């Protein structure tokens, strides 16, 4: 799975618990979008989370 180019955010793993407290594995995936941003003055297509886009840490080209 891809990870956020700016923050390094990636899939995390844990357990979900039923009412009887039985455990099963599950994962939480970040909302990643492939966008073009400027990296070292050149446009590059990278994976960026929507939270990073909304916060203004990167700007699209």
Curated annotation (Swiss-Prot):
Which residues lie in Polar residues bias regions?
9-27
GO terms, biological process: translation
Q: Which SUPFAM superfamilies match?
A: L28p-like
Xref: InterPro entries: Bacterial_rp_bL28, Ribosomal_bL28, Ribosomal_bL28/bL31-like_sf, Ribosomal_bL28_bact-type, Ribosomal_bL28_sf
Q: Where is this region: Disordered?
A: 1-27
Choose one Gene Ontology CC annotation of this protein and give it: ribonucleoprotein complex
Similarity-based family: Belongs to the bacterial ribosomal protein bL28 family.
Q: What is this protein called?
A: Large ribosomal subunit protein bL28
Question: Which species does the entry assign this protein to?
Answer: Lactobacillus delbrueckii subsp. bulgaricus (strain ATCC 11842 / DSM 20081 / BCRC 10696 / JCM 1002 / NBRC 13953 / NCIMB 11778 / NCTC 12712 / WDCM 00102 / Lb 14)
